[in-house]
UniProtKB/Swiss-Prot annotation:
Originating species: Prochlorococcus marinus subsp. pastoris (strain CCMP1986 / NIES-2087 / MED4)
Keyword rRNA processing: no
Protein name: Urease accessory protein UreF
One of the record's GO molecular function terms: nickel cation binding
Family: Belongs to the UreF family.
Main location: cytoplasm
InterPro entries: UreF, UreF_sf
Pfam families: UreF
């Protein structure tokens, strides 16, 4: 694909339906429980998630999916790799503790698959299954020939921007402050991305379960955020 180094911006553009999602993934409940109301609290929360949170597992799975797509493209062990693809995706979705969170993932994945199909890259593997956002993102990057490091960096950047976008609606924080925090996190995003690329998936762990537990109250957030 021509100019594939620019195509990646389609995935994180807030002007597109895929980039326009603003789910907070339990952030509202977490802030309420912890009584966090300052922008610095949001920065610290995101920093902790990047260092020891679930986002690291999801990002690493991007590479695992990517490698499977490479194998499938060259028709290497097709049945085995398709089973591996489905198994890994089901395992990843199981990390999502509520129906709302899982629905969020599969809805976003469906939209991204529709986008890649418009570009001539229809997803052909288990496309009738509930599929995670991470798998869809990996498929898009594989199709657009985006390298693995950029894939991880863009994924984490987009996740961070999404959390900040949700935070603007939840606490007294303007968009300029949110952009400032995003800028301050760039070095960490780059560092974490390289670490994930270099790591083995079996060596990663989730050490911060607070945000995951807050997802248990996601239903209230789901209605409030979209009503606004």
């Amino acid at each position: 694909m021509k100019k594939n180094h620019l195509v990646k911006y389609l995935l994180i553009s807030p002007s597109l339906p895929v980039g326009g999602f603003c789910y907070s993934e339990g952030l509202e409940s977490y802030l309420k429980i912890k009584n966090l109301e300052e922008p610095d609290h949001i920065r610290n929360l995101i920093t902790n998630e990047l260092k020891i949170g679930q986002i690291r597992i999801e990002a690493k799975c991007l590479i695992e999916f990517f490698d499977i797509f490479v194998e499938l493209k060259i028709a290497n062990n097709i049945n085995k790799n398709r089973r591996r693809l489905l198994s890994l995706d089901k395992w990843l979705l199981s990390f999502r503790d509520t129906v709302e969170i899982r629905d969020q993932q599969t809805q976003m994945a469906k939209s991204l698959f529709e986008l890649t199909k418009e570009f001539g890259f229809e997803y052909l593997y288990e496309k009738n299954k509930n599929i995670s956002w991470s798998l869809a993102w990996s498929w898009a990057c594989f199709s657009f020939q985006i390298n693995k490091l950029e894939m991880i960096e863009n994924f984490i950047y987009a996740w961070t921007a999404n959390q900040l976008s949700a935070a603007i609606r939840l606490i007294p924080m303007g968009s300029i402050k949110a952009q400032t925090i995003q800028l301050e996190l760039l070095d960490l995003i780059s560092e974490v991305s390289q670490e994930i690329v270099d790591s083995n998936i079996n060596d990663l762990y989730v050490g911060n379960i607070s945000l995951s537990m807050a997802q248990q109250n996601h239903n209230d957030l789901y209605t409030k955020l979209f009503r606004n």
